Amino acid sequence: MTTLAIDIGGTKLAAALIDKNLRISQRRELPTPASKTPDALREALKALVEPLRAEARQVAIASTGIIQEGMLLALNPHNLGGLLHFPLVQTLETIAGLPTLAVNDAQAAAWAEYHALPDDIRDMVFITVSTGVGGGVVCDGKLLTGKGGLAGHLGHTLADPHGPVCGCGRVGCVEAIASGRGMAAAARDDLAGCDAKTLFIRAGEGHQQAQHLVSQSAQVIARMIADVKAITDCQCVVIGGSVGLAEGYLEQVRAFLMQEPAPYHVALSAARYRHDAGLLGAALLAQGDTL
């Protein structure tokens, strides 16, 4: 059965047809609408899926935010440009005329990455470091989503009680410091206004402040991983996202994690499916690979 998989992120929308063997075809991308109003998102999704829907039998959505009974909510509304209570499943069922499933993008990515691991791995955590910081938890071979869809939102654990205010309302969240948005917000002087991609470029050129911002992000993520290990006793952690997959970043996270006491050490690896993990995980779930 062919699935039309959609990934809704803070900066881009992606869609592709995925068959039962997880082969991807006809991948398309559009920028996430700048206005992020309900009408703008609805029109962008329509333009994205219209060329693909005739060949699909169902729709699977991986989206940033919290999914509750088909509604798209946000723990940090800034990641969705203030968009709240968007009827995601209903909208796609209307556009595509197909049965539709929706799940958080990091939870979906965790499910895809779990299936790429050896069979003896039953407990793993996926962490995405991108516009925000998110995650997904697989425990004893089951994906944890939680009653309200909140499970795995690791970016909203505490990093610094004196840190910046997070979009979720807490002070000092991991996401407020370590995410691409958090790094950019902390940039000063000649780096003011730079996005995370530019900060990595400048860090590679030897810019001291840029190197500090990247290093600070990696250290915060490493400390969060130590917390995650203590809570879940996971066998491995997989890192994805545009920041998480940036050159040299995982190595820094690993080095900082090794500075933590030995009980908190855990194997780290880069996401095998990279930027397609959300699409593939959502397709797996829609094809009956249940929670």
From Swiss-Prot:
Name of the protein in question: N-acetylmannosamine kinase
Annotated keywords: ATP-binding, Carbohydrate metabolism, Kinase, Metal-binding, Nucleotide-binding, Transferase, Zinc
Species in which this protein is naturally found: Salmonella schwarzengrund (strain CVM19633)
Catalysed reaction equations from the record: an N-acyl-D-mannosamine + ATP = an N-acyl-D-mannosamine 6-phosphate + ADP + H(+)
InterPro entries: ATPase_NBD, ManNAc_kinase_bac, ROK, ROK_cs
Its EC number(s): 2.7.1.60
GO biological process: one example: N-acetylneuraminate catabolic process
GO molecular function: ATP binding; N-acylmannosamine kinase activity; zinc ion binding
Stored HAMAP family: ManNAc_kinase
Family the UniProt entry places it in: Belongs to the ROK (NagC/XylR) family. NanK subfamily.
Pfam assignment, any one: ROK
